[in-house]
A protein has these predicted regions:
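Internal intein/HINT superfamily modules and their associated LAGLIDADG
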Residues: 1-258
Length: 258
């Protein structure tokens, strides 16, 4: 989908400068990893144990430094980023709302590093994002209202209820976004992909899509530490790592499958 001439993404303002950007690797020519290359340098790094500190906001996608990885069919490295990838956020706790002929995407996350990654991922798709702290040391990341997101909203919304489209499937880039927003390791050999607490109508279809991607998981209800799908076993975790690609620079150690 062409992003030129659609919506107001070019006029959107970058996130407030209250969030230190991680140091970036020296850019190298070649295939983009998770989006367009960063320009310039950034200062400091995010606090992984608390809310963002004063600093400059990251506006470009992080580089993973894993250019030697072999591409996996349907993996995050196998295609350029598109707006359709944002369905991965809606598979998790992301929300989309419509206003007139436009739509806005938002997601609440539980750690500062996730803000870095999501702002960069949205920027790589031509969507400027803002963020703000919320209750419980969480952060809300959201786009502006834009016509670019109207097809995504039309596919996922039935009235105001979020529901996956009939042909929904999970690619590496969709999984990468879901994991960046709401993926949590569960040692020694598990990984949780968290769901929207009010999205019960989505859970079964999301589980089917995970199974089709080779990531059949166990649905955990709210009383079991969820809602989330638990992915277990070395083979499935290796498959997850292949599909989502290497960790973004802002990711804390052990927070990403490898």
């Amino acid at each position: 989908m062409s992003l030129s001439g659609l919506g107001d993404t070019g006029k959107a303002q970058p996130p407030p400068a209250l969030f230190p950007a991680p140091e970036s690797d020296t850019p190298t020519p070649g295939r983009r990893r998770g989006g367009a290359p960063q320009n310039g340098s950034s200062q400091g790094g995010p606090s992984h144990d608390g809310p963002p500190q004063n600093g400059s906001a990251q506006t470009g996608p992080p580089r993973t430094g894993d250019e030697g990885r072999q591409l996996v069919f349907f993996g995050a490295d196998a295609a350029e980023p598109t707006v359709a990838d944002l369905a991965g956020l809606l598979a998790g706790p992301g929300e989309v709302v419509r206003m007139g002929g436009t739509a806005r995407l938002s997601v609440q996350v539980d750690a500062a590093w996730r803000v870095h990654v999501l702002v960069a991922e949205l920027a790589s798709r031509g969507l400027a994002a803002s963020w703000e702290p919320t209750e419980g040391e969480r952060h809300a990341v959201r786009t502006s209202y834009t016509r670019v997101l109207k097809p995504l909203a039309a596919a996922w919304l039935h009235g105001t209820t979020k529901r996956p489209p009939a042909a929904f499937h999970l690619t590496g880039r969709r999984l990468r976004l879901w994991l960046a927003a709401a993926g949590t390791p569960e040692p020694p050999d598990g990984f949780l992909l968290r769901l929207g607490p009010d999205d019960q109508e989505c859970w079964e279809s999301i589980g089917v899509a995970l199974g089709a991607a080779g990531l059949a998981g166990t649905l955990l209800g709210p009383g079991e530490g969820g809602p989330a799908y638990r992915i277990t076993g070395r083979r499935r975790l290796a498959r997850l790592a292949e599909l989502v690609g290497g960790p973004p620079i802002a990711t804390p150690p052990h927070a990403w499958p490898t």
